[in-house]
């Protein structure tokens, strides 16, 4: 792979550009970052992400222009190790976990990362969501999963945060190719109604509403209450509902709904509405289908690219825009192309007639680039 500098424009896909730059060893230049904005340049959370990636690598050089609208990133080797970081309250901790998950198998020493900030936020995947659905996909590519964990020591909601998450991951020499096209049938729904610094009766109202929203779909629904007090509850009051559906093949879909952050304008969301919203979001995710949750498609695409030179298949549901752009970035950084087939066309006639959710599923096939962990010390 050539080491010429790749040039990008704009602030979108910032974290995957940095992660892919480190994995491929190719320097990048990002220009015109919010150049027409009232506050041009990179935001505080983006500079924190750069700082975090500098801590888990060795020899990374970053140049940020005076206005902050241009970043030149020259990647180093991935070392991993023990790192503590305060992520601030602008973005959810999952924003920082995403690049870490992509880099973690290829470190010199296993990662132990302690992140402080917001664990659950509206409009973003939560740390719970990553723990439930991403780690399941991670396991398929990395066999040694004994150290793999995302521990939520304290929950933190916006605007104050106060959550604490510890991420640990194993290291491997190479990933293994994966063939996943069986989805199976949904056999159980599990969930967590979390309340921090508010009365726990709200949790039971959310649970009731969610069960009513999913009534008639499946009987095995079990939702626990996660009530956090003191420091474990973070610094802001709030409540939300996180749901997962597991299939007979071990595929996990996840969905979440959360209350409005304290001090935000607008009508407060009732616990009943949150329960209904989470229930419907989960049913929508199940309908979309695929052999993984749609948010984890980027993880599967990246790991399929970094596999040994062998074929991997993965059945995706409809691809969100973020996944499509991730595939384009993989082509730019690793010169890899994915073969995508309409899943309906690959089925036999009697299978195609079964009502198995969305018709827009794609069978994604790729041959890995033969990536191996050169940082790992061999005993």
Curated annotation (Swiss-Prot):
InterPro entries: RNA3'-term_phos_cycl_insert (IPR013791), RNA3'_phos_cyclase_dom (IPR023797), RNA3'_phos_cyclase_dom_sf (IPR037136), RNA3'_term_phos_cyc (IPR000228), RNA3'_term_phos_cyc_type_2 (IPR016443), RNA3'_term_phos_cycl-like_CS (IPR020719), RNA3'P_cycl/enolpyr_Trfase_a/b (IPR013792), RPTC_insert (IPR036553)
Major place of residence: nucleus
GO biological process: one example: ribosomal small subunit biogenesis
Protein origin, superkingdom: Eukaryota
Keywords for the protein's UniProt record, in alphabetical order: Nucleus, Ribosome biogenesis
Subcellular location per the Swiss-Prot or TrEMBL entry: Nucleus, Nucleolus
GO cellular component entries: nucleolus; small-subunit processome
Function: Part of the small subunit (SSU) processome, first precursor of the small eukaryotic ribosomal subunit. During the assembly of the SSU processome in the nucleolus, many ribosome biogenesis factors, an RNA chaperone and ribosomal proteins associate with the nascent pre-rRNA and work in concert to generate RNA folding, modifications, rearrangements and cleavage as well as targeted degradation of pre-ribosomal RNA by the RNA exosome. Does not have cyclase activity.
Protein name per Swiss-Prot or TrEMBL: Probable RNA 3'-terminal phosphate cyclase-like protein
UniProt source species: Caenorhabditis elegans
């Amino acid at each position: 792979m050539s080491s010429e500098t790749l040039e990008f424009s704009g602030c979108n896909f910032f974290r995957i550009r940095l992660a892919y730059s480190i994995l491929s060893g190719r320097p990048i230049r990002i220009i015109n970052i919010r150049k027409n904005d009232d506050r041009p340049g990179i935001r505080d959370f983006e500079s924190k992400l750069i700082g975090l990636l500098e801590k888990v690598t060795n020899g990374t050089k970053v140049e940020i222009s005076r206005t902050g609208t241009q970043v030149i990133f020259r990647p180093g080797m991935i070392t991993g190790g023990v790192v503590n970081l305060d992520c601030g309250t602008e973005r959810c901790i999952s924003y920082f976990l995403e690049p870490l998950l992509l880099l973690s198998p290829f470190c010199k020493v296993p990662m132990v990362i302690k992140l402080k900030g917001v664990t659950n936020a509206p409009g973003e995947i939560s740390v719970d969501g990553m723990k439930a659905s991403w780690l399941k996909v991670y396991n398929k590519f990395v066999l040694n999963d004994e150290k793999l964990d995302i521990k939520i020591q304290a929950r933190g909601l916006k605007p104050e945060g106060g959550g604490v998450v510890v991420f640990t991951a194993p290291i491997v020499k190479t990933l293994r190719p994966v063939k996943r096209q069986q989805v199976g049938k949904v056999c159980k729904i599990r969930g967590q109604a979390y309340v921090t610094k508010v009365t726990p009766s709200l949790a039971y109202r959310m649970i009731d509403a969610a069960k009513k929203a999913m009534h008639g779909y499946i009987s095995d629904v079990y939702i626990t209450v996660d009530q956090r007090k003191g420091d474990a509850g973070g610094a802001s009051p709030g409540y939300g509902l996180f749901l997962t559906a597991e299939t007979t093949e071990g595929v996990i879909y996840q969905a979440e709904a959360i209350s409005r952050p304290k001090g935000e304008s607008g009508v407060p969301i009732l616990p009943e509405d949150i329960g209904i919203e989470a229930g419907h979001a989960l049913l929508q995710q199940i309908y979309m289908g695929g052999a993984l949750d749609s948010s984890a498609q980027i993880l599967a695409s990246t790991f399929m690219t970094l596999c040994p030179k062998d074929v991997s298949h993965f059945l995706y549901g409809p691809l969100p825009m973020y996944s499509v752009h991730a595939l384009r970035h993989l082509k730019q950084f690793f010169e890899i192309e994915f073969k995508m087939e309409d899943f309906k066309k690959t089925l036999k006639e009697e299978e195609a007639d079964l009502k198995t959710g969305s018709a827009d599923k794609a069978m994604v096939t790729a041959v890995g680039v033969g990536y191996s962990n050169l940082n790992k010390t061999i005993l």
